[in-house]
Amino acid sequence: MVRMRCREEQAPTGKSMGECIISLRGWHPALAQAELSALFPTGRVEQLSSPRLARITCKGDEQEFTIAAGIEATFQHGVNTPWIDEASLLNEIKNHLQMYSHGNASCAVHAWKHGEGISDCSRTTLAGNIGGVLSRMNAVIDLEQPERIFGVLLDGHSQTVTYGWLMDGGPKGDSSTGRRASQRPFFKPVSLEPRLARLAVNLACGPLAEGTCLDPMTGTGGFTIEAVLSERTAVGIDLDLEMIEGARRNLEWAGSNVDPFVQGDATDVRASLPEGFPVPFSGTVLDPPYGRNSHGSMDHSILLQKTLLSAADVTQGGLVLILPSEPRPDCIERALSRDERPPLKHYSWQELEGILESTSWTYQKAWYIAVHGSLGRVLIFATNALQD
């Protein structure tokens, strides 16, 4: 990472709509693209020449940028251009800085890469030369605490360069690494990693203003914890009191003092909710607890059908359903076509789609998530008739 700082005249700070370019995390770009479209349904999200880059129309101050699991960085008024040579790029950046100056805030240059980057371009040299451009524009170089960062991203997949002022101080680290499921006081080996749980909530529920997240089989509380930490309202339900008490401890450990957990039955959500609780929910997230089925000997298919029917009764929005599958090669740059989907552990795909249809959910897309050599997961997105 190379950083330099400067000072320039103040730029306008209005909240008019403009274009941003989003840099996405590499662990699953296709899911990150889907999450982005869900969080910004009116943003005209467009994938660029790399699966880790997208263009979006936005104001630039939406809270959704700060809660997305898949966003690495946001370039305000960003530009994505094919790599030609450094001289051409520096000329482009000079013109861009004349149009979008930073103002009196201190600033830095941060250059990084996706994949192998661009072989004949040194990030260190490029960042230094951009600092030179800023100096010739009467910028004061300051290598300490930037108030704004000018970003330059070299993408190896597309051989393009993305540049612009970065929102919220530049590329952000993956905050979920500090709250791994295995670090919680109440842990089960089946717990989802927080970044996947966060993405699932965002995909199912959409923008923050849409409403409350339903987690009808909360288990150790992963989905509900991520919803609450995103400042969503949420309800986590489980039939097992041990799970409810453990999920409460986990949420308190994560830094929240709210209590969104309810002991109840996933197959009868409406009856499990506190009296007068407002419905519909904006989305449902479901990772059925196979292997520790709190509903005893109930058949997998019957349990899933009853739960999905109960959720559809109180949800107007999306469903994210995560199911175990046979392993298959990684597929992180696109959703699975129907003939690419791996066999599920407990259902045939025909049976699953029949269950969805019979419970008023419409299958939309599925993505594969690798777990280990003998197990995978499939994340399925569906919508209900009310949303359709």
List each model region and its residues.
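Phosphate-coordination loops involved in phosphoryl transfer and adenosine-cofactor binding
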Residues: G103-S106, E210
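Basic, glycine-rich polyanion-binding accessory segments appended to enzymes
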Residues: V109-K113
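Conserved AdoMet
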Residues: R55-S101
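Intrinsically disordered, low-complexity boundary segments flanking structured domains
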Residues: E92-M99, A139, Q350-G354
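Class I S-adenosyl-L-methionine-dependent methyltransferase catalytic core
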Residues: R5-I71, H114-C121, T125-L126, R136, ...
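Short acidic low-complexity segments
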Residues: V140-P146
